[in-house]
Amino acid sequence: MKLLALAVLLLAVCSLEGAFVRRQAEEPNLQSLVAQYFQTMTDYGKDLLEKAKGPELQAQAKAYFEKTQEQLTPLVKKAGTDLINFLSNFMDLRTQPATQ
């Protein structure tokens, strides 16, 4: 019985001591968190830059932009023509009542 009580007492003391030590542990302050964040972002940026230097990625990007340009050029031309026609109709409507 005494051994059981001693074991429980020892467990309680160790548990309290562990909680006390955790409270005394230094909490990371805001400055160190921001510094760590910027360091991580810098490392990520460097890795991304190294990957972007590869000719394969550049070729893929060039092909993507060329394909996009091929698809968008007719749409932009049509939109420009439609806009000019639309504005021309408004100008014609304004000039007709003035001439009558």
Swiss-Prot record:
Q: What GO cellular component entries does it have?
A: spherical high-density lipoprotein particle
- Database matches in SUPFAM superfamilies: Apolipoprotein A-II
Write the gene name: APOA2
Q: Write out the function statement from the record.
A: May stabilize HDL (high density lipoprotein) structure by its association with lipids, and affect the HDL metabolism.
Q: What is this protein called?
A: Apolipoprotein A-II
Q: Where are the transmembrane segments?
A: none
Q: Which InterPro entries match?
A: ApoA-II, ApoA-II_sf
The superkingdom listed in its UniProt entry is Eukaryota
Q: Which organism is it from?
A: Leptonychotes weddellii (Weddell seal)
